[in-house]
């Protein structure tokens, strides 16, 4: 008896193709049926932001276009708009007041544009925002006024910009924020006042910044933090920085300049994972203490084979986790 699997696969593919071809993407001035509330205008040849979106529109996507500016009235008359996707365009700035009269807007994607700055009160009337990706732009400064009315915000993406410092209390109104991505910027120093107010923060991504200094108690007021990435920074010392973070599930310290380290936390969560790879470790009694702590607390180590000794000379290039205690710490 011949298998019916190929015929079933063909049937499924045909059904999927039919469904795809039947899906019509509407963009003004093309008229849309009254039940259509989502509009997609993603033509690479589009140079001007479309006009004529109906008041019932709930989602508008104008992405992967040549659009470089929006008029201050571009989004007026859209009281039901919930999602606005403007990524992968050529936007350089936005007019103040652009997002007024959008009481239901919860998602605003401005990623992958050419934004160098934004008006101080650009998000003042966007108080319902939950998701705000500003990643992959050219922002060099953060203005605290941007975030003063975003009390509902949960996810903020500021990665892949040119931010050199975070103003004091910049995020202190973001009481509900759970995820903050500041990776691939130019931060050199971290201090407690930079992250004040982020009482519910669970995920903080700081990797690929030239961070050389972390002021004591920087992370002491973020007990809910479960993911912290400082990968690919320039850290040489992290003594005591993470002790209050008892709910940590992932701590990524890979690709730094660490030669030695005390156990990063006293009390660990049941499923803590740790990445120590890519550092120039000194394979001595201090490292043995760290690895003993890892084993005793059942810590999961990522990339064990890349935890390599840089010193002493007779251990250089050796995998630290494969060495016996009597070799590393013979005393």
UniProtKB/Swiss-Prot annotation:
Main subcellular location of this protein, as a coarse class: secreted
One Pfam family hit: LRR_8
Positions of the LRRCT domain: 279-330
Keywords, sorted A to Z: Glycoprotein, Leucine-rich repeat, Phospholipase A2 inhibitor, Repeat, Secreted, Signal
SUPFAM superfamilies: L domain-like
Compartment(s) where it occurs, according to its Swiss-Prot or TrEMBL record: Secreted
Gene Ontology CC: one annotated term: extracellular region
GO molecular function, one term: phospholipase A2 inhibitor activity
Signal peptide: 1-23
Sugar-modified residues: 35, 125, 232, 271
PROSITE patterns cross-referenced by the UniProt entry: LRR
LRR repeat residue numbers: 78-101, 103-125, 127-149, 150-173, 175-197, 199-221, 223-244, 245-268
Assembly, per entry: Homotrimer.
Biological role: Inhibits the enzymatic activity of the basic phospholipase A2 (PLA2).
Family under the similarity heading: Belongs to the beta-type phospholipase A2 inhibitor family.
Protein name: Phospholipase A2 inhibitor
Species for this entry: Gloydius brevicaudus siniticus (Chinese mamushi)
Lineage of source species: Eukaryota, Metazoa, Chordata, Craniata, Vertebrata
């Amino acid at each position: 008896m011949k298998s019916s699997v190929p015929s079933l696969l063909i049937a499924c593919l045909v059904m999927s193709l039919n469904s795809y071809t039947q899906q019509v993407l509407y963009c003004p001035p093309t008229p849309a049926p009254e039940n259509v509330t989502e509009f997609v205008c993603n033509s690479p040849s589009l140079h001007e932001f479309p006009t004529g979106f109906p008041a019932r529109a709930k989602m508008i996507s104008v992405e992967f276009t040549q659009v470089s500016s929006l008029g201050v009235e571009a989004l007026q008359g859209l009281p039901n708009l919930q999602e606005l996707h403007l990524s992968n365009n050529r936007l350089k700035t936005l007019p103040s007041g652009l997002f007024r009269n959008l009481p239901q807007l919860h998602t605003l994607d401005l990623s992958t544009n050419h934004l160098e700055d934004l008006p101080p009160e650009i998000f003042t009337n966007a108080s319902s925002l939950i998701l705000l990706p500003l990643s992959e732009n050219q922002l060099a400064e953060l203005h605290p006024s941007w975030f003063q009315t975003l009390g509902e915000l949960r996810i903020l993406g500021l990665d892949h910009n040119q931010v050199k410092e975070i103003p004091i209390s910049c995020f202190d109104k973001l009481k509900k924020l759970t995820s903050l991505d500041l990776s691939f910027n130019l931060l050199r120093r971290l201090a407690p006042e930079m992250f004040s107010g982020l009482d519910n923060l669970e995920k903080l991504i700081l990797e690929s910044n030239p961070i050389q200094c972390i002021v004591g108690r920087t992370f002491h007021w973020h007990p809910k933090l479960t993911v912290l990435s400082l990968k690919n920074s320039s850290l040489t010392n992290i003594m005591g920085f993470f002790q209050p973070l008892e709910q940590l599930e992932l701590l990524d310290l890979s690709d730094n300049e660490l030669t030695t380290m005390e156990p990063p936390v006293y009390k660990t969560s049941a499923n803590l994972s740790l990445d120590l790879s890519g550092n120039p470790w000194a394979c001595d009694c201090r490292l043995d203490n760290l690895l003993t702590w890892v084993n005793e607390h059942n810590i999961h180590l990522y990339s064990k084979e890349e935890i390599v000794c840089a010193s002493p000379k007779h251990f250089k290039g050796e995998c630290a986790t494969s060495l016996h205690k009597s070799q590393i710490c013979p005393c």
